[in-house]
């Protein structure tokens, strides 16, 4: 971690601040457009592969980057076409593409806890599971103040295990999620609170 703790207002403009800003600007590229379409994002991604040598493209969130070429009203067909375009881009440019896709509204179970979503809870349901190579769940447990990362799908079993999971806690001093090992004190303030 470049900062070794969370920066404060007094850090703005210091050498360390400038060094960190330079690192971010040299290693992260934000595609900022007035209107996002899948084709325009992939075109800009291809440009960044050629000019900057990027190896990873993150689309966050999925529902804000629309595929305007799709004329099909069927959400499953739309999702399949969307994922196919991304797969073709990833193979052509040898780039990892990560799509952040939020589930539809999740309801509480009989114990009052929010149900854990699956890939089928994303709009376009089964296509997310069928057409993607990998699927990870990131799910918060507000009571335990932990975040679970669970493998929902691995296409090639030598790359991971379906159902594998790890738990993390937010460490405010560093601004990082760290592996969860002990109970968290009840008065700890979490970033989503």
Stretch-by-stretch model annotation:
Residues 64-66, 104-108:
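Short, active-site-adjacent cap segments at secondary-structure transitions
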Residues 58-59, 95-102:
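Structural recognition of the conserved hydrophobic beta-strand(s) that form the central parallel beta-sheet
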Residues 29-92:
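Phosphate-binding/switch loop-helix module in NTP-utilizing enzymes
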Residues 62, 102-103, 140-141:
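Short, ordered loop/turn segments at secondary-structure junctions
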Residues 29-31, 98, 136:
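Hydrophobic/aromatic beta-strand patches that form the interior of the parallel beta-sheet core
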Residues 2-11, 15, 23, 38-57, ...:
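C-terminal regions of RecA-like/P-loop NTPase motor modules
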Residues 18-29:
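A short helix-to-beta-strand connector/capping loop
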């Amino acid at each position: 971690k470049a900062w070794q703790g969370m920066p404060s207002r007094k850090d703005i403009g210091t050498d360390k601040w400038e060094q960190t800003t330079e690192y971010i600007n040299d290693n992260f590229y934000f595609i900022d457009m007035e209107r996002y379409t899948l084709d325009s994002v992939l075109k800009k991604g291809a440009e960044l592969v050629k000019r900057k040598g990027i190896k990873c493209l993150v689309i966050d969130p999925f529902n804000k980057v629309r595929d305007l070429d799709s004329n099909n009203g069927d959400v499953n067909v739309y999702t399949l076409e969307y994922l196919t375009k991304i797969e073709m881009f990833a193979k052509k440019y040898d780039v990892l593409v990560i799509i952040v896709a939020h589930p539809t509204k999740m309801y509480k179970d009989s114990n009052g806890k929010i149900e854990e979503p699956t890939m089928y809870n994303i709009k376009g349901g089964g296509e997310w599971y069928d057409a993607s190579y990998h699927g990870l769940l990131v799910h918060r447990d507000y009571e335990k103040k932990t975040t679970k990362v669970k493998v929902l799908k691995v296409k090639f079993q030598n790359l991971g295990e379906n159902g594998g999971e790890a738990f993390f806690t937010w460490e405010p001093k560093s601004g990082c999620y760290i592996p969860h090992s002990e109970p968290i004190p009840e008065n700890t303030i979490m970033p989503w609170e």
